């Protein structure tokens, strides 16, 4: 198993952090780390403007502690019914295609929010206002599903503080709701959280050779697959996240091999409740330029103007996605390939 991806040597903290029990707990967990006061977790110039050559070092050594200000819920309809206020953002990993790094400077190490009680209370109130889910949808037929980790990986966050354990415990006692998060990291600590079926883990997977190039600092794909039965026995609902689907010569053969491995490893109990989401690659010009400075090999696969087209995002950024018409054909082929190897795996959504 890969070693834990953090070796915290400096902690940037907002003024109010030590007023919270969770803040004091985290500081005690990393007693040797240098403490650097900052006015806001959003504005740390030495992280935002750092040399891309230090990209991985900042992710490994830096931790930001702050107080979550906006406790808002956004409708989703894809991975979840709602995006919950996050207990963190940023990530210790460095997946070459990841959009998270566009939001807060390219390094974007983990920022952990210490006001977890307020985040949990706001979530419980929001769930109570929804009442029972009367109309089934692709997200879940009965429960309102809340994405808890839109901008990070909660399996890694669980090695920093008790925030993830607290959120799993919260949803254990919310009869009309489930928590959900995607992960590329295997953390055995999650096995002791007793989710009782009220937290859905979406295990992110791609062919191993592709992951070695693109999923930097993550758990190997074989370890992620091996962890699925254990997580299910521990009480988690397990779905699969095939994301991003990156097209290259021989993609059908390598994805077919992945589906065969899953079919061989997963027990019947997992297959009976399995569903998947499929997300075709979308890349970003700004991230492309950063990647060229630290991981140009990845850009040979991610930046493909010959089969991609530009799309301007709502925020004004220039994205590249697979060309209209072609993308639909490739997506159909992907779904057909999945169905031929894993006919029991329902596709919740694909785009």
Task: Go through each PLM region and give its residues.
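Auxiliary Fe-S-binding modules of radical SAM enzymes
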Residues: 1-23, 263-351
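Conserved, mostly hydrophobic/aromatic
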Residues: 95-98, 203, 240-243
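Flexible, acidic/Gly-rich N-terminal and inter-domain linker regions that tether
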Residues: 1-81
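Conserved C-terminal portion of the radical SAM core fold
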Residues: 224-288, 337
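Structural preference for beta-strand elements that scaffold enzyme active sites
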Residues: 10, 143-147, 178-180, 198-202, ...
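Conserved radical SAM core fold
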Residues: 148-155, 186-190, 199-218, 244-249, ...
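Conserved Radical SAM active-site core
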Residues: 64-79, 100-202
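Local cysteine-cluster metal-coordination motifs and their immediate loop/turn environment
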Residues: 86-103
């Amino acid at each position: 198993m890969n070693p834990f991806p953090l070796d915290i040597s400096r902690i940037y903290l907002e003024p109010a952090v030590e007023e919270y029990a969770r803040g004091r707990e985290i500081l005690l967990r990393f007693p040797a780390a240098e403490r650097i006061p900052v006015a806001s977790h959003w504005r740390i110039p030495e992280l935002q403007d750092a040399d891309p050559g230090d990209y991985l070092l900042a992710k490994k050594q830096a931790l930001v502690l702050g107080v979550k200000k906006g406790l808002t819920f956004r409708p989703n309809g894809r991975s979840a019914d709602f995006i919950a206020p996050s207990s963190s953002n940023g990530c210790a990993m460095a997946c070459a295609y990841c959009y998270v790094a566009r939001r807060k400077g390219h390094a974007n190490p983990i920022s952990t929010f210490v006001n977890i009680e307020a985040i949990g209370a706001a979530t419980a109130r929001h769930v109570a206002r929804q009442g029972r889910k009367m109309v089934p949808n692709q997200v879940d037929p009965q429960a309102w599903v809340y994405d808890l980790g839109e901008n990070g990986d909660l399996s890694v966050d669980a090695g920093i503080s008790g925030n993830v354990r607290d959120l799993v415990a919260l949803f254990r006692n919310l009869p009309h709701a489930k928590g959900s998060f995607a992960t590329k990291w295997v953390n055995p600590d999650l096995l002791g959280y007793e989710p009782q079926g009220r937290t859905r883990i979406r295990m992110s997977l791609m062919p191993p050779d592709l992951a070695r190039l693109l999923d930097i600092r993550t758990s190997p794909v074989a370890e992620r697959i091996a962890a699925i039965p254990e997580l299910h026995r521990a009480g988690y609902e397990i779905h699969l996240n095939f994301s991003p689907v990156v097209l290259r010569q021989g993609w059908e053969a390598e994805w077919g091999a992945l589906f065969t491995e899953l079919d061989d490893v997963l027990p019947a109990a997992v297959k009976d409740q399995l569903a998947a989401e499929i997300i075709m690659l979308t890349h970003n010009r700004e991230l492309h330029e950063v990647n060229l400075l630290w991981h140009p090999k990845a850009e040979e696969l991610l930046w493909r103007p010959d089969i991609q087209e530009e799309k301007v995002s709502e925020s004004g950024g220039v994205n590249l996605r697979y060309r209209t018409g072609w993308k639909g054909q490739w997506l159909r082929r992907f779904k057909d390939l999945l169905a031929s190897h894993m006919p029991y795996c329902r596709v919740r959504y694909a785009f």
